[in-house]
From Swiss-Prot:
It is an enzyme of class 2 (transferase). Its EC number is 2.1.1.176. PANTHER family: NOL1_NOP2_SUN FAMILY PROTEIN _ ANTITERMINATION NUSB DOMAIN-CONTAINING PROTEIN, NOP2 YEAST -RELATED NOL1/NOP2/FMU SUN DOMAIN-CONTAINING. This is Ribosomal RNA small subunit methyltransferase B.
Amino acid sequence: MKKQRNLRSMAAQAVEQVVEQGQSLSNILPPLQQKVSDKDKALLQELCFGVLRTLSQLDWLINKLMARPMTGKQRTVHYLIMVGLYQLLYTRIPPHAALAETVEGAIAIKRPQLKGLINGVLRQFQRQQEELLAKFNASDARYLHPSWLLKRLQKAYPEQWQSIVEANNQRPPMWLRVNRTHHSRDSWLALLDEAGMKGFPHADYPDAVRLETPAPVHALPGFEDGWVTVQDASAQGCMTWLAPQNGEHILDLCAAPGGKTTHILEVAPEAQVVAVDIDEQRLSRVYDNLKRLGMKATVKQGDGRYPSQWCGEQQFDRILLDAPCSATGVIRRHPDIKWLRRDRDIPELAQLQSEILDAIWPHLKSGGTLVYATCSVLPEENSLQIKAFLQRTADAELCETGTPEQPGKQNLPGAEEGDGFFYAKLIKK
């Protein structure tokens, strides 16, 4: 039996690590969840994701409720108060329980002398809630995005930025990919129905299913046997443009955690696939996914800027480059991105993408296909990136995705309930 822990203090410390230390919630949360009971795992996740999703609102409220900010060793208390405010605003937890558990969190973070302060701030919010929220809703903080990102979205999408922001602030649906080597989508949907769950097929992507209600993966029919994989619908769109064929040599570059590698092998089981990623730790997830689905691929650690180091002079029939990016298209799924990214990251990422494109292009066979993909919505990483590449690369031709003036296909967050995603299909003349 697992020791009873204070979930509010755990959530506060996790959020602090994201915001103050730049750590990814994807790395922080799983080890914390191992320390709590199964019934508490979901609440811990809800508190962490929820606070990060609404961080700018909670920060704004604390600045109004407190005379001066908590600093130094007391900074964790700032995030503990955020957790308390989030519960009062967005959860069905009874207010008295939310207050009591949050105040007790002060003991867990070794600040028992501040219990009175935490209690006082939260009770003050309860008294002034209506007035404070009216003022908040008249401020730019209501968009729940950092100002630098808001400015970029407003510039890139003058007519659509508000709908993008709204989609980013929603909870994401759970999308699945049915393994067509085991089941047709319709036959797996019938199994899902028998298991008491409901799913909906995507109109454009032939393997994609959206669950009516998110569910644990172990509850999904055949998950352990590789019948189905969790993957957003927009990410599945890569296969529409890549169109892998049996017998081809295909490179999946920047492949971790392996969702697209295994999708290639589902579509073309006899393809020779090489999966490469710079992050050796994340490659372990590629191996895990291949094993669960009973598939084989050549997996290598390598830097996309220096392909000769890991593939020599080898050329490929098709290349999928899922380029490192700002991930601004998947904020609803990873709200910590809003606070991990900085404005200065964008030109640096664009430069890295450009270097990888230039380095990998010679490894594409004449007549071959390269699909450039990102989970970003920023033009500097997407249409402008491809436009510049086409201008400097004489034997590259845009195919099926956009025009030379506006290259690529941009999915915006929430469109057809998918994530924000960009694709450009290039052919080597």
